[in-house]
């Protein structure tokens, strides 16, 4: 299969517009990726001709819509190589997925005096829920620090895991630094360390950034949980996926109560809950979002996951080389990375640089990127972040470099 970025761009009409008199250069896909026509049209078709509430109706439209939603569950299981569709829980996004784990798994398995391990490179979505829970339960949160290259030193892990470590929760791909963590090796090492101390350790991987750049095989990774959002994968917002190992989901209590997640409700006899994954899907789901997610998976699969990765890696190599031509530009993170490039320009505030770039039609992200510990690590308040996607071109990178050089001249 031959990957053609020119052909891919035809699937994204938003990229044809001009911003401030310049062709749009969209380098903010790590925040949210643009949507291809096929995803938009599939959602529209469903709403126009097929929409109905799912799971509880016996009429034709409801039964058909239920089959479509459940087919996407099977599709996602296949896409990330889960063992069963029953290991796929639909959530609003990565943030809700991690909060679900914290409030269900965490309350069931983590006790006062226990500890968990997170890393210094985490998005706030994989920090705040654990601190909120720790305030209530009283467990310790241990932090795996970054090294000078923006990577994790695996030798340090042995000092963090002991017999009372219940969870290791870390990102697959840093949303700021582009660091690709060696997930399989980390998990293998962590499990070995826990086994040596007769501990019971589970592993959560935040796949929000990795899902659009890498093929994911949760069985090969040997993680217990893997979470990601649809809108990073060229799908709609408001829908995401929590993969959970079935034996764990079976043992976890529901987090939210309501319709659809029960077997029986009796004011006299009490409540019995549905089996996973439906136990964790209270209320009416984001039906159209699920349909759109299925269309997004169809789209990226049709392009070829290996081909996408090759295109993006070649583009990253090109971008890293070209950005070094900008004299006062400081890069953050490792030389080998995927998806995102964090930088600052001289002593200029990231907000000012981003505002100037916008005048040239270039969309990047500025700020702390919901990763304040990373900012603290590098002793800065904010960074600029350019991110790559399937529709990014070398011409986009060239435009960024030229604009940064102009800003250097303007701001001094």
Swiss-Prot record:
PANTHER family: CYSTEINE DESULFURASE (PTHR43586:SF25). Pfam families: Aminotran_5 (PF00266). It comes from Photorhabdus laumondii subsp. laumondii (strain DSM 15139 / CIP 105565 / TT01). InterPro entries: Aminotrans_V_dom (IPR000192), Aminotrans_V_PyrdxlP_BS (IPR020578), Cys_dSase_SufS (IPR010970), PyrdxlP-dep_Trfase (IPR015424), PyrdxlP-dep_Trfase_major (IPR015421), PyrdxlP-dep_Trfase_small (IPR015422). PROSITE patterns: AA_TRANSFER_CLASS_5. Its cofactor is pyridoxal 5'-phosphate. It catalyses: (sulfur carrier)-H + L-cysteine = (sulfur carrier)-SH + L-alanine; L-selenocysteine + AH2 = hydrogenselenide + L-alanine + A + H(+). It is found in: Cytoplasm. One of its GO terms (molecular function) is pyridoxal phosphate binding. Belongs to the class-V pyridoxal-phosphate-dependent aminotransferase family. Csd subfamily. It comes from the Bacteria. Cysteine desulfurases mobilize the sulfur from L-cysteine to yield L-alanine, an essential step in sulfur metabolism for biosynthesis of a variety of sulfur-containing biomolecules. Component of the suf operon, which is activated and required under specific conditions such as oxidative stress and iron limitation. Acts as a potent selenocysteine lyase in vitro, that mobilizes selenium from L-selenocysteine. Selenocysteine lyase activity is however unsure in vivo. Pathway: Cofactor biosynthesis; iron-sulfur cluster biosynthesis. The modification N6-(pyridoxal phosphate)lysine is found at residue 232. GO terms for biological process: cysteine metabolic process. This is Cysteine desulfurase. The gene is sufS.
């Amino acid at each position: 299969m031959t990957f053609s970025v020119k052909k891919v761009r035809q699937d994204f009409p938003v990229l044809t517009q001009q911003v401030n008199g310049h062709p749009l250069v969209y380098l903010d896909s790590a925040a949210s990726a643009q949507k291809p026509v096929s995803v938009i049209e599939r959602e529209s078709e469903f709403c126009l001709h097929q929409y109905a509430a799912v799971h509880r109706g016996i009429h034709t439209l409801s039964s058909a819509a239920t089959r479509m939603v459940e087919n996407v569950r099977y599709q996602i299981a296949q896409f990330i190589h889960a063992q069963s569709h029953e290991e796929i829980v639909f959530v609003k996004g990565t943030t809700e997925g991690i909060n679900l784990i914290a409030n269900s798994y965490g309350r069931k398995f983590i006790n006062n005096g226990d500890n968990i391990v997170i890393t210094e490179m985490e998005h706030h979505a994989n920090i705040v829920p654990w601190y909120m829970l720790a305030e209530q339960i009283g467990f310790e949160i241990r932090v795996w620090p970054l090294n000078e290259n923006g990577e994790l030193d695996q030798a340090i892990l042995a000092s963090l895991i002991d017999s009372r470590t219940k969870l290791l929760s870390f990102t697959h791909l840093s949303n700021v630094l582009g660091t690709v963590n060696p997930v399989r090796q980390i998990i293998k090492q962590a499990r070995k360390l826990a086994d040596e101390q007769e501990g019971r350790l589970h592993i959560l991987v935040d796949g929000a950034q990795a899902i659009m750049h890498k093929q994911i095989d949760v069985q090969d990774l040997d993680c217990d949980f893997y979470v990601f959002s649809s809108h990073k994968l060229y799908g709609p917002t408001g829908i995401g996926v929590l993969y959970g190992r079935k034996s764990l989901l079976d043992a976890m209590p529901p987090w939210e109560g309501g319709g659809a997640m029960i077997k029986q409700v009796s004011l006299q006899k009490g409540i019995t809950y549905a089996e996973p994954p439906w136990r964790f899907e209270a209320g009416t789901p984001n039906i159209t979002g699920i349909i759109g997610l299925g269309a997004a998976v169809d789209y990226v699969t049709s392009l070829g996951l290996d081909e996408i990765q090759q295109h993006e890696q070649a583009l990253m190599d090109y971008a890293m080389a070209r950005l070094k031509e900008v004299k006062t530009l400081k890069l953050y993170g490792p030389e080998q990375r995927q998806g995102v490039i964090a930088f600052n320009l001289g002593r200029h505030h990231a907000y000012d640089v981003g505002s100037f770039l916008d005048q040239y039609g270039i969309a990047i992200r500025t700020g702390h990127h919901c990763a304040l510990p990373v900012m603290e690590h590098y002793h800065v308040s904010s960074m600029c972040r350019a991110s790559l996607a399937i529709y990014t071109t070398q011409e986009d990178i060239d435009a960024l470099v030229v604009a940064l050089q102009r800003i250097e001249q303007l701001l001094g």
